[in-house]
């Protein structure tokens, strides 16, 4: 018996998206970003699908936020290059990086101090992060020369040191700040050895000059556009997730009757309501407004009333023939998650990563 609700993950779409991103950035290696449980698609699901060399759809490496994520990927048998995008947090983490062959970002002086205070069995591969304008992590231009020299002189650091930055506005292509960041990064790193990586998903899709040695696609890998008002399908990408549930009740509803907590919505006509087995306890946003679409039997029907913990209600219409057990699609190929996110007033990243453990993640 299939569980409901569930997130159906398409291995074919994941592979197709990786192939498409390689076409968009043919001169770059791909560091597939699988942090936050593979953007809600299942960390090992994604890593294993994209290390299938027999399918010609294997990533060159994987980007993760936390050491625990990287260790889970290694324990799952994935031998590809791994990069900790937030770097290590404690000096005790460094021997684990060596043992499991994990690259690390270095973005703060405290990490330099830890690298200089330990004795390691072999050097760690480091990606030095430059703050080119994001002002979140990374070293300023005034610090760069000294930091780079410290890394070069440290026997615990493998040579060459690799170089990276992160864009703050690449998902707003009308702004020229990304070009400013690229120029800043290139001026600081000109002539230095080592690989470079600048481009996140928006960089890959909208700023081809940023693609460099490695690209770091995250949301685009899952078939979703990083840009408001855009769809992944506009770039030849396919959504890898379909969030589905089912109708657990169909009810006759009279004009003037309300539904749900707070009697928030009142019917203006006689109709039929459907109750869908998903709610904010599953990660579907409680603040989804009236009219947010759900797909039932191939047609869009609006949410009515408040989303509750385990259920939401949709207006099926007065002539609906839908029945208990019918499939309800919350987002997917026929109902893009970008559109649902815009309707709710959030971003697709948040929707796919906030699904709770009650939602079964099922790889096809």
From Swiss-Prot:
Catalytic residues, chain numbering: 35, 261
Annotated metabolic or biological route of this protein: Amino-acid biosynthesis; D-alanine biosynthesis; D-alanine from L-alanine: step 1/1
Residue list for modification N6-(pyridoxal phosphate)lysine: 35
Single Gene Ontology MF annotation: pyridoxal phosphate binding
BP terms from Gene Ontology: D-alanine biosynthetic process
Family matches, as InterPro entries: Ala_racemase, Ala_racemase/Decarboxylase_C, Ala_racemase_C, Ala_racemase_N, Ala_racemase_pyridoxalP-BS, PLP-binding_barrel
Cystines in this chain: none
Residue sites binding substrate per the record: 136, 309
Key words of the record: Isomerase, Pyridoxal phosphate
EC assignment: 5.1.1.1
Catalytic activity, reaction form: L-alanine = D-alanine
CDD domains registered for this protein in UniProt: PLPDE_III_AR_proteobact (cd06827)
Gene Ontology CC: one annotated term: cytosol
Cofactor section: pyridoxal 5'-phosphate
Highest taxon, organism lineage: Bacteria
Family: Belongs to the alanine racemase family.
Role noted for this protein: Catalyzes the interconversion of L-alanine and D-alanine. May also act on other amino acids.
Protein's recorded name: Alanine racemase
Originating organism: Shewanella amazonensis (strain ATCC BAA-1098 / SB2B)
Gene: alr
